[in-house]
Curated annotation (Swiss-Prot):
Its main location: mitochondrion. Component of the cytochrome c oxidase, the last enzyme in the mitochondrial electron transport chain which drives oxidative phosphorylation. The respiratory chain contains 3 multisubunit complexes succinate dehydrogenase (complex II, CII), ubiquinol-cytochrome c oxidoreductase (cytochrome b-c1 complex, complex III, CIII) and cytochrome c oxidase (complex IV, CIV), that cooperate to transfer electrons derived from NADH and succinate to molecular oxygen, creating an electrochemical gradient over the inner membrane that drives transmembrane transport and the ATP synthase. Heme a3 binds at H376. The chain crosses the membrane at residues 12-40, 51-86, 95-117, 141-170, 183-212, 228-261, 270-286, 299-327, 336-357, 371-400, 407-433, 447-478. Its EC number is 7.1.1.9. Belongs to the heme-copper respiratory oxidase family. Fe(II)-heme a binds at H61, H378. The lineage of its organism: Eukaryota, Metazoa, Chordata, Craniata, Vertebrata. This is Cytochrome c oxidase subunit 1. PANTHER family: CYTOCHROME C OXIDASE SUBUNIT 1. Component of the cytochrome c oxidase (complex IV, CIV), a multisubunit enzyme composed of 14 subunits. The complex is composed of a catalytic core of 3 subunits MT-CO1, MT-CO2 and MT-CO3, encoded in the mitochondrial DNA, and 11 supernumerary subunits COX4I, COX5A, COX5B, COX6A, COX6B, COX6C, COX7A, COX7B, COX7C, COX8 and NDUFA4, which are encoded in the nuclear genome.
Length: 519
């Protein structure tokens, strides 16, 4: 019965599929909002109305893309599908909690959409800084609904994190050490630890904001002895690990894709890759104030946060060069997932370089809240996280469905998307260097050219999104079934066949000669 299968499912594959479908749907909503933003900015003058409406759209775009697209797809979708298969577990450690983790997301999404629909909407930016988010500048229920939405999404992620940590540590076969698990499993494990440690701090911050708004507390109100900068510290102590949460599972997927399409049986520098991810996870917690260089931190604090931020480039560089070394000497198979992986490596590196620029507190004073920052984080998210999702989706699509995507169209789709996102975000570096500020719906005429170019790029990206929907439809319509897969000895998830049976590995695994086989 469909209702019992999809509503009450405790099967990691079904829940993973639910996450993927939900994330894809939310991604379309987020994409629609981004196109509204670029339509508004395509020429000087107003399109949508006042800046409140514009900022509500910007805020909703950010929340949807982060909490309802990237995280559900990467952690909920790929994580649920692949982690149990890769470690040879029959399912997740807590299958019913897994179900609850998913079903907290649709109500959370509904609350976020409601927040945009009632009163004037939450036009605070995704950071929700007071006093703008206080009950004077944002009277009404909008910000409160946003806070409740974040609470639900946060609970969902914390439960999911507990589940992934328990699963990866406890549900491996006895013969498999933690250092024999695939890199994607490591990336999800580290991501889960980051979620578990950072989300409670966000919950504390937004709960204090909630009481400031409704119960007359003054945590963030100087009139009662509070400090709005405290909120920024609490938010960014979550917010910076969050951006690593968004990219780490992508690192794991890229490692698998690069290894597979280079014809290698393992990635270059496995232990280096693991330690690099652990270093990134740790360092991600001690650099948060680089988002706050303009709030009058003292010079020693600025010097520390500048240096600590730059240190993150080292483990990141280890990963980039290990991916390149994995390809070295291999027989490269130029399939679509490999194109996405190569695009990821190049564009993520570009985004990382602009990040090094922004890490300098002196430069950041001038660049903070300009389009240079927007360009930076869209290079690592819109071209990092999203490219990893696309590559992973195409690579594992046969595993999920038993069908293969149309290879030529998948490559054309990559080309269109690559052109679109670069045309959208590269010019934004120029706008930022010319001091165009973020979060404004209009701008002086001098900025017209690059804004128009950027908006044309967003339309090309839209064409790519529509192409992807068509390519997926085509695969299900044509029903090209998978015939054979190589490298199953080191790619454990493929061992069950394509598509994977509903229940896998009810018997335990034993390890013989580095090959996992059914006992």
């Amino acid at each position: 019965m469909a209702i019992t299968r999809w509503l009450f499912s405790t099967n990691h594959k079904d829940i993973g599929t639910l996450y993927l479908v939900f994330g894809a749907w939310a991604g379309l909503v987020g994409t629609a909002l981004s196109l509204l933003i670029r339509a508004e900015l395509s020429q000087p003058g107003t399109l949508l109305g006042d800046d409140q409406i514009y900022n509500v759209i910007v805020t909703a775009h950010a929340f949807i893309m982060i909490f309802f697209m990237v995280m559900p797809i990467m952690i909920g979708g790929f994580g649920n599908w692949l982690v149990p298969l890769m470690i040879g577990a029959p399912d997740m450690a807590f299958p019913r909690m897994n179900n609850m983790s998913f079903w907290l997301l649709p109500p959370s999404f509904l609350l976020l959409l409601a927040s945009s629909g009632v009163e004037a909407g939450a036009g605070t930016g995704w950071t929700v800084y007071p006093p703008l988010a206080g009950n004077l500048a944002h009277a009404g229920a909008s910000v409160d609904l946003t806070i409740f939405s974040l609470h639900l999404a946060g609970i969902s992620s914390i439960l999911g994190a507990i589940n992934f940590i328990t699963t990866t540590i406890n549900m491996k076969p006895p013969a498999m050490s933690q250092y024999q698990t695939p890199l994607f499993v490591w990336s999800v494990l580290i991501t889960a630890v980051l979620l578990l440690l950072s989300l409670p701090v966000l919950a504390a911050g937004i709960t204090m904001l909630l009481t400031d708004r409704n119960l007359n507390t003054t945590f963030f109100d100087p009139a009662g002895g509070g400090d709005p900068v405290l909120y920024q510290h609490l938010f960014w102590f979550f917010g910076h690990p969050e951006v690593y949460i968004l990219i780490l599972p992508g690192f794991g997927m890229i490692s698998h894709i690069v290894t597979y399409y280079s014809g290698k049986k393992e990635p270059f520098g496995y232990m280096g890759m693991v330690w690099a991810m652990m270093s990134i996870g740790l360092l991600g917690f001690i650099v948060w104030a680089h988002h706050m260089f303009t709030v009058d931190l003292n010079v020693d604090t600025r010097a520390y946060f500048t240096s600590a931020t730059m240190i993150i480039a080292i483990p990141t560089g280890v990963k980039v060069f290990s991916w390149l070394a994995t390809m070295h000497g291999g027989t490269i198979k130029w399939d679509a997932p490999m194109l996405w992986a190569l695009g990821f490596i190049f564009l993520f590196t570009v985004g990382g370089l602009t990040g090094i620029v922004l890490a300098n507190s002196s430069l950041d004073i001038m660049l903070h809240d300009t389009y240079y920052v927007v360009a930076h984080f869209h290079y690592v998210l819109s071209m990092g996280a999203v490219f990893a999702i696309m590559g992973g989706f195409i690579h594992w699509f046969p595993l999920f469905t038993g069908y293969t995507l149309h290879e030529t169209w998948a490559k054309i789709h990559f080309g269109v998307m690559f052109a679109g996102v670069n045309l959208t975000f590269f010019p934004q570096h120029f706008l930022g260097l010319s001091a165009m500020p973020r979060r404004y719906s209009d701008y002086p005429d001098a900025y017209t050219l690059w804004n128009t170019v950027s908006s044309i790029g967003s339309l090309i990206s839209l064409v790519a999104v529509i192409m992807m929907m068509f390519i997926i439809w085509e695969a299900f319509a044509a029903k090209r079934e998978v015939t054979t897969y190589e490298l199953t000895s080191t790619m454990l998830e493929w061992l069950q066949g394509c598509p994977t049976p509903y229940h896998t590995l009810k018997t335990s695994l034993v390890q013989i000669n580095h090959q996992m086989i059914k006992s």
